[in-house]
């Protein structure tokens, strides 16, 4: 199962959390680090050995026309849309135009996972892919019970993905931090530092 993951934020965290919660006996490949550009996705695909049950490929865009190329390369069985925000907005006339570009990842994907809280993405997905695709709204599952909204939504996406794959909800208690993404570190004088340098 090839999984394409896109969104303004959360691509790498969702990818890493899926990888960290993979059931025993399921061989999984994931694109390294944040390899989500045209070149990064192509390099990731070349690393797949072929006997994996799940291959997680990030797809990031910054310009119009990029997602059509990524969709042809990745050809996902499952498309995951993590979020919709203002990243790379300067290259698009409107949020809707950027959203339409991102939605191209799911053009031929039989199954689509998204979070209903992100508009206009959720409405556009339901309208554009109403037929011929199975849509799964992650807002309808419990998630991991995280205190911050971004982590909770990411956990709901991960849980929904595993349910789509016919697996039970994962145990989020064993998750390890993803480097430079809300990573909590010990500081001096009994302080805590939150390293979100990547974002």
Where are these regions (language model features)?
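Short, glycine-rich nucleotide/cofactor-binding loops
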Residues: 193-199
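Short intrinsically disordered, low-complexity coil segments enriched in acidic
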Residues: 1-7, 55, 70, 142-143, ...
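Acidic, Mg2+-coordinating active-site environments of NTP-dependent enzymes
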Residues: 78-192
């Amino acid at each position: 199962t090839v999984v394409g993951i896109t969104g303004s934020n959360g691509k790498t965290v969702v990818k890493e959390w899926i990888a960290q919660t993979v059931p025993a006996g399921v061989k999984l490949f994931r694109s390294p680090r944040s390899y989500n550009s045209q070149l990064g996705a192509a390099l990731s695909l070349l690393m797949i050995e072929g006997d994996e049950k799940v291959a997680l490929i990030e797809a990031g865009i910054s310009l119009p026309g990029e997602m059509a190329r990524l969709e042809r390369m990745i050809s996902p069985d499952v498309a995951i849309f993590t979020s919709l925000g203002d990243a790379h907005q300067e290259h698009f006339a409107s949020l809707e135009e950027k959203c339409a570009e991102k939605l191209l990842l799911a053009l031929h994907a039989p199954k689509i996972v998204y979070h209903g809280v992100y508009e206009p993405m959720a409405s556009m997905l339901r309208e554009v892919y109403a037929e011929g695709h199975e849509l799964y709204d992650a807002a309808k599952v419990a998630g991991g019970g995280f205190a911050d909204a971004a982590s909770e939504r990411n956990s709901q996406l991960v849980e929904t993905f595993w349910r789509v794959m016919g697996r039970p909800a994962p145990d989020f208690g064993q998750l390890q931090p993803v480097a430079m993404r809300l990573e909590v570190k010990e500081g001096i004088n009994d302080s805590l530092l939150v390293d979100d340098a990547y974002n």
